[in-house]
């Protein structure tokens, strides 16, 4: 139950409403998990299409099914979604006169539970499918792949024209609700919570203690099933609970990993990363200590430092900037893998031929 204590903030009973930062963080948690899993599935499907291709083709449906099991598990046992429970929050039934005595371990009532599942699982699935449909219709419109019916053509063009405004109104609805929540004018940061008949609150000490002792109490009170149907029902419940528990454990570890990657690659953190991974300053190049009388360098700028003759097919080394004959420097670099003057590691691909007007 480390997730209960990781983000727990001490608060009085009268001030159990979470801050805007907590609710926005838990909203963005599952939003970050979906594309991460989608990328993993894409890599697997590209590496082995025969075995993992179906995961990519049916990713939305598989993810929705797993999300359904996960959210139902948490809502019925912790009165919160996975992300809300991760940040130490719970869902409180609106209008419940005994909400102060109701513990999170009791779970949500059936009505609020299925409403919450609908808005947590079904609505995001429909939104993803709608966005894919809009993208597909835009491609058809762009490449003039129109269906034969002109009435259908006018309909989907009107749909494409109206979709950005509908989407803007939808996002604006959520933005206004968040602003009202920040100003203390609303008890919900999301209108979907109000439609589900719940509001968010922080887990209390009693909630955390009840959640920690619930598995032990359930195992002690469990009675052996008598009939075959009861045994099958019990086995199915255990299987679903095991899948949900495995998903929650894997997601908890994955979330910490995602947050670490987000911190590591954030633009604000680049200077810190550079200071942590900075290597000691290397010594100055050897060729800077050479004077004009160095025996390694010819006195005339048109002479090759290797053959001491006028250069033919001028070729510069990208690693040092010195110019040689192509034949001389090619054989030297291929044999020694270094610059003849500075000793810098050099490969054949670092040779750059020069084409001057004199040639």
Swiss-Prot record:
Residues 48-51, 140-144, 278-359 are cytoplasmic. Pathway: Protein modification; protein ubiquitination. Its main location: membrane. One of its GO terms (molecular function) is ubiquitin ligase activator activity. A zinc finger (RING-type) spans 304-343. Keywords: Disease variant, Membrane, Metal-binding, Peroxisome, Peroxisome biogenesis disorder, Protein transport, Transmembrane, Transmembrane helix, Transport, Ubl conjugation pathway, Zellweger syndrome, Zinc, Zinc-finger. It is a multi-pass membrane protein. Pfam families: Pex2_Pex12. The keyword Membrane applies. Changing residue 34 to S: In PBD-CG3; benign. GO terms for biological process: cellular response to reactive oxygen species; peroxisome organization; proteasome-mediated ubiquitin-dependent protein catabolic process; protein import into peroxisome matrix; protein import into peroxisome matrix, receptor recycling; protein import into peroxisome matrix, substrate release; protein monoubiquitination; protein polyubiquitination. It is found in: Peroxisome membrane. GO terms for cellular component: cytosol; peroxisomal importomer complex; peroxisomal membrane; peroxisome. The chain crosses the membrane at residues 20-47, 52-76, 110-139, 145-183, 250-277. Changing residue 320 to F: In PBD3B; attenuates interaction with PEX10 and decreases peroxisomal protein import. Residues 1-19, 77-109, 184-249 are peroxisomal matrix. InterPro entries: PEX12, Pex_N, Znf_RING/FYVE/PHD. The keyword Zinc-finger applies. It is linked to Peroxisome biogenesis disorder complementation group 3: A peroxisomal disorder arising from a failure of protein import into the peroxisomal membrane or matrix. The peroxisome biogenesis disorders (PBD group) are genetically heterogeneous with at least 14 distinct genetic groups as concluded from complementation studies. Include disorders are: Zellweger syndrome (ZWS), neonatal adrenoleukodystrophy (NALD), infantile Refsum disease (IRD), and classical rhizomelic chondrodysplasia punctata (RCDP). Peroxisome biogenesis disorder 3A: A fatal peroxisome biogenesis disorder belonging to the Zellweger disease spectrum and clinically characterized by severe neurologic dysfunction with profound psychomotor retardation, severe hypotonia and neonatal seizures, craniofacial abnormalities, liver dysfunction, and biochemically by the absence of peroxisomes. Additional features include cardiovascular and skeletal defects, renal cysts, ocular abnormalities, and hearing impairment. The three subunits of the retrotranslocation channel (PEX2, PEX10 and PEX12) coassemble in the membrane into a channel with an open 10 Angstrom pore. The RING-type zinc-fingers that catalyze PEX5 receptor ubiquitination are positioned above the pore on the cytosolic side of the complex. The RING-type zinc-finger is degenerated and only coordinates one zinc ions, preventing E3 ubiquitin-protein ligase activity. Component of the PEX2-PEX10-PEX12 retrotranslocation channel, composed of PEX2, PEX10 and PEX12. Interacts with PEX19 via its cytoplasmic domain. Belongs to the pex2/pex10/pex12 family. PANTHER family: PEROXISOME ASSEMBLY PROTEIN 12, PEROXISOME ASSEMBLY PROTEIN 12 PEROXIN-12. Component of a retrotranslocation channel required for peroxisome organization by mediating export of the PEX5 receptor from peroxisomes to the cytosol, thereby promoting PEX5 recycling. The retrotranslocation channel is composed of PEX2, PEX10 and PEX12; each subunit contributing transmembrane segments that coassemble into an open channel that specifically allows the passage of PEX5 through the peroxisomal membrane. PEX12 also regulates PEX5 recycling by activating the E3 ubiquitin-protein ligase activity of PEX10. This is Peroxisome assembly protein 12. The lineage of its organism: Eukaryota, Metazoa, Chordata, Craniata, Vertebrata.
